[in-house]
Amino acid sequence: MFDLVTVDAVDSVALAAFWATSCGLTEVEREDDGRWIVLAEPATGLRRLGIQRIGGLLPAQAAWAGDRKARIHLDLRCGVGEIDAEVARLVSLGASVVRSSRDETYGRIVTLADPEGNLFDLCAYG
């Protein structure tokens, strides 16, 4: 069982703010210089997401080309009737749509990138 998922960032403070607002998480840990920030679900302290500041080109920025995907990404869940509104909310927070809404056998999916280019899918299962 994993403890948390870590996302690499050039601006860890800004990216942590994006993910905290996007997923309803709160900051539970931060190194003084902001190099390492941990977010978690407020009620339980679970669903931990680490944001780690690095330098240079991020793997997700280098990995996406045409139909190739980054090797790992997050899946966020929303209700079937909520996907368009949720995409609009995420875009207003700084995300960008990488691949438009599409139907898969397990539900409707939209691929987005966070403000630093890390890919994630918004999934409406059902």
Predicted regions and their residues:
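Glyoxalase I/VOC metalloenzyme domain signal
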Residues: 1-3, 7-29, 40-98, 113-126
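Short acidic/glycine-enriched loop/turn segments that link adjacent beta-strands
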Residues: 32-36, 104-108
